[in-house]
Curated annotation (Swiss-Prot):
Tissues expressing this chain: Expressed in B-cells, hair follicles, foreskin keratinocytes and adult skin. Also expressed in psoriatic tissue.
Residues engaged in binding Fe cation: 398, 403, 578, 582, 701
Gene Ontology biological-process annotations: arachidonate metabolic process; ceramide biosynthetic process; establishment of skin barrier; hepoxilin biosynthetic process; linoleic acid metabolic process; lipid oxidation; lipoxygenase pathway; positive regulation of gene expression
Protein name: Arachidonate 12-lipoxygenase, 12R-type
Cofactor requirements of the protein: Fe cation
Location within or outside the cell: Cytoplasm; Cytoplasm, Perinuclear region
Main location: cytoplasm
Similarity remark: Belongs to the lipoxygenase family.
Length: 701
């Protein structure tokens, strides 16, 4: 008689436990046990419980390879979902086997789990294990499907179609499943979030935290009448009265210094969209800036051509915004532009704007604005640039290049890699809650009656159009961080804390990935010969990049260095890159004139006519301001249940080498965090968005 001691861990999140019956079957190389009910006197499988059980077998089962968890109805109780963390089994010879689950069992079902050692297809020889791999992938591909959200954008996780309940007093003008949360000013497509699989949803704690923060803020705006006010702001200082939540050093600094040229230039380096600016070596024909125009702003003893040759001239070009249509908000036509902004990095170490053109086509009705123009002309020209920056940030840098791409990475992972695959173990922590937050984003942002329809001048169609254009130009090289800085010519630009911190995190991450990859892939042949890996890469190319060859994204990977680069890009995109464009979002957008989502008057065509009154009349009205601010506040505040980069409480790797690599990675991140905090002590505006302590493992907000 062989005795196996079993430990079963239930998740710690509220409602993780179950009243259903749980049975276990153990499969080894020399046989399998009978199905045995795991049952003690009293409650089993309560939230946070680690139950200990004994399984008796007539003979030793040999090396344990698979277990089966059977979830069945208990007495008269209704179906009760269960979140299983892991199962550990101590064999008669004293060896401990670990079977990671970290997933929900929703209905009455059987879940087969493999022993935790990471293995590629080439590492498996037993027919039962090879068949298990195939069956797991087949089941996931039957369950998780790709779906086109909008043509030209990455595909996303299909939400099953449910017939809405019949309502006697249904509004025929409201799309099915759209509704309001009390006080919240926009429609939310509940179907996009309600029917997600449990394994893709927020935990109960995170869900509660998210909606508890949302409701009171919305109701406060509603009670004060702000969400019904379609008038212009009377005074700039009135905008400060709607600052949401707790103010910070940065948000206060933004409100005080937003109109200054030095802060305007600073945001291109260390704001929430720090990946746009590039060195300019030649003034483009479409932006006819002359030396006479800008010479007074370059300093003594120099000229525009000399500064171009020295590498001190930089360009922000918003050409991707050109020709996008606008909508009406609060009954008033909104306006749009695609500006160009020329900046100079002076000897005092500051990035300063020196010329702005509010169109991609020069002409008499499109003057070039200069710092020497009237105060309100220059300020309004800069505000138009900040308006374009809003869409460059929200549509491209934030939503497309992190959220939507990361969701495609996640779904391809689930559909093509079994849980025992080392890449699954490496990447799965970086997909946590991404599908859930993207479903919320689609329900709130890109929904008929949502934010883009009620708070943005481009509307749903225009906002999506910007992303479609950006995806058509996205390249693999641009996602490879070190190459991006070189390609934009900013690799040696002083005071670029985003670059310094992102490269530090990238290097730590790349070293960690290298150690893991080289442990499981000893040769290039091992990479090229892994069919599951190749299927994952191929599906990303097809569903995320839409099969566009010009993107430079690989269809397959042939060498170990290629795999290291690819995986590093994936993890960085899902963690640090998102933190860089998301964490500071509210601090830079809470003061609306610094980041307006709509403009109510056309771009100025004649100098000398702008006044405070015309400036205020161009900014968004009170209602639009509050709607935009409320939604951005909701979607930028990380709810509870956080997991900082490098913290992996779910144990997927059990081998000693990858465990050492994880610990070394954590130590490197701790050093980076210390260095960032020491540097920030000497800065007037601290840059902490890439402090590893504040970087989430995954895109979860």
């Amino acid at each position: 008689m062989a005795t196996y001691k079993v430990r079963v861990a239930t998740g710690t999140d509220l409602l993780s436990g179950t009243r259903d019956s749980i049975s276990l079957t153990i499969v080894g190389t020399q046989g399998e046990s009978h199905k045995q009910l795991l049952n003690h006197f009293g409650r089993d499988f309560a939230t946070g419980a680690v139950g200990q059980y004994t399984v008796q077998c007539p003979q030793d089962l040999g090396e344990l390879i698979i277990i089966r968890l059977h979830k069945e109805r208990y007495a008269f109780f209704p179906k009760d979902p269960w979140y299983c963390n892991y199962v550990q089994i101590c064999a008669p010879n004293g060896r401990i086997y670990h079977f990671p689950a970290y997933q929900w069992m929703d209905g009455y079902e059987t879940l087969a789990l493999r022993e935790a050692t990471g293995k590629t297809t080439a590492d498996d020889s037993l027919p039962v294990l090879l068949e298990h791999r195939k069956e797991e992938i087949r089941a996931k591909q039957d369950f998780y499907h790709w779906r086109v959200f909008l043509p030209g954008l990455p595909s996303y996780v299909h939400i099953p179609s449910y017939r809405p309940p019949v309502r006697r007093h249904r509004n025929p003008n409201r799309p099915e499943w759209n509704g309001y949360i009390p006080g919240f000013p926009i429609l939310i497509n509940f179907k996009a979030t309600k029917f997600l699989n449990l394994n893709l949803r927020y935990s109960f704690l995170k869900t509660a935290s998210f909606f508890v923060r949302l409701g009171p803020m919305a109701l406060a705006f509603k009670v004060r009448g702000l969400l019904d006010c379609k008038h212009s702001w009377k005074r700039l200082k009135d905008i400060r009265k709607i600052f949401p939540g707790k103010k910070s050093v940065v948000s206060e600094y933004v409100a005080e210094h937003w109109a200054e040229d030095t802060f305007f230039g600073y945001q291109y380096l260390n704001g929430v969209n720090p990946g746009l600016i590039r060195r300019c070596t030649r003034i483009p024909d479409k932006f006819p800036v002359t030396d006479d125009m800008v010479a007074p702003f370059l300093g003594e003893g120099t000229c525009l051509q000399a500064e171009l040759e020295k590498g001190n001239i930089y360009l922000a070009d918003y050409r991707i915004m050109e020709g996008i249509p606008t909508v009406e908000l609060s009954g008033r036509k909104q306006h749009h532009c695609a500006p160009l902004c020329l900046l100079h990095f002076g000897p005092e170490g500051k990035m300063m704007p020196i010329a702005i053109q509010l169109s991609q086509t020069p002409g008499p009705d499109c003057p070039i604005f200069l710092p020497s123009d009237s105060e309100w002309d220059w300020l309004l020209a800069k505000t138009w640039v900040r308006y374009a920056e809003f869409y460059s940030h929200e549509a491209i840098a934030h939503l497309l290049e992190t959220h939507l791409i990361a969701e495609a990475f996640c779904l391809a992972l689930l559909r093509n890699l079994p849980m025992c695959h080392p890449l699954y173990k490496l990447l799965i922590p970086h997909t946590r809650y991404t599908v859930q937050i993207n479903s919320i984003g689609r329900a709130v942002l890109l929904n008929e009656g949502g934010l883009s329809a009620k708070g943005m001048s481009l509307g749903v169609e225009g906002f999506a159009g910007v992303m479609v254009r950006a995806l058509s130009e996205l390249t693999y090289d641009s996602l490879y961080l070190p190459n991006d800085f070189v390609e934009r010519g900013v690799q040696d630009l002083p005071g670029y804390y985003y670059r310094d911190d992102s490269l530090a995190v990238w290097n730590a991450l790349e070293k960690y990935v290298t150690e893991i990859i080289t442990y499981y892939y000893p040769s290039d042949a091992a990479v090229e010969g892994d069919p599951e890996l190749q299927s994952w890469v191929q599906e990303i190319f097809k569903e995320c990049l839409l099969g566009r060859e010009s993107s430079g994204f690989p269809r397959c990977l042939r060498t170990v260095p290629e795999l290291i680069r690819y995986v590093t890009i994936v993890i960085y995109t899902c963690s640090a890159k998102h933190a860089a464009v998301n964490t500071g979002q509210m601090e830079f957008t809470a003061w609306m004139p610094n980041f307006p989502a709509s403009m109510r008057n056309p771009p100025i065509q004649t100098k000398g006519l702008t006044t405070l009154e015309t400036f205020m009349d161009t900014l968004p009205d009170v209602k639009t301001t509050c709607i935009t601010l409320l939604v951005l506040w909701t979607l930028s505040r990380e709810p509870d249940d956080r997991r900082p980069l490098g913290h992996f409480p779910d144990i997927h790797f059990v081998e000693e080498a990858p465990r050492r690599s994880i610990e070394a990675f954590r130590q490197r991140l701790n050093q980076i965090s210390h260095d960032i905090r020491q540097r920030n002590k000497c800065l007037p505006i601290p840059y902490y968005y890439l402090d590893p302590v504040l970087i989430e493992n995954s895109i979860s907000i």
